[in-house]
Amino acid sequence: MSQAALVTGAASGIGRAVAQRLEEDGMDVLAVDLQPDPDGPGTPHEADLTGTEANARAVDTALERFGRLDVIVANAGVQHVAPIEEFPVERWELIVSLLLTSPFVLAKQAWPALRDSGAGRFIAIASAHGLVASPYKAAYVAAKHGVVGLVKTLALEGAQDGITANAVCPGYVRTPLVERQIPDQARAHSLSEEDALEQVILAPHAIKDLIEPAEVAGVVAFLAGPSGRAFTGAPVTMDMGWTAR
């Protein structure tokens, strides 16, 4: 029987690349998204993961469809950029629910299946912002730091059952989420969009380039496979030298 994976935020960007790569590697994939792509990789599953029950149902759906669940990739994300005094509380709550509470509920619901796998893998797509901060991103930075703490805890809890838990921490990736940040950053910093990309988005990168989604998917595939068994409780950085500063 093939291994099975659940990938959130799977209709575009990093999640789509991860779902495609894991499927190419022979896994059955439940591709979870608020607006799933029926023509995309994996089996599409619609879910609003800001709700606790939707996360639990997604795990149950994967188990019902595939009969097992070996890999969770918690990738779904959203961003909001604003100074703290202008940051809407409702956006804080939405971001934290999707970026931090959703991975927690997925892990909680899937834990028995990951244990039964014998080599369960929990992989969160965190960010360089799980290790360092930038202004105007209070909710995102707080949630991503929380995800790094979550995988460290899961790694310790899962060690005796062969479960690993890691957080992939990329810099800026060429995704719709990053592209949507450019006008927000331009407004927040009173810059043109072109200058916002050069001076803000890529400023932390020692290598001045965006990361490709397929590159992140390659790291996820490694962590999900047998060669990744020594990695657990780790923030796995791939940030173009951002956190080397």
Annotate each predicted stretch with a short phrase.
Residues 73, 159, 164, 231-233:
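Short, small/polar-rich loop/turn modules that mediate ligand/substrate recognition or access, typified
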Residues 132, 220-221, 232-245:
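Short C-terminal tail/terminal secondary-structure segment
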Residues 107, 143, 151:
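Active-site helix of classical SDR
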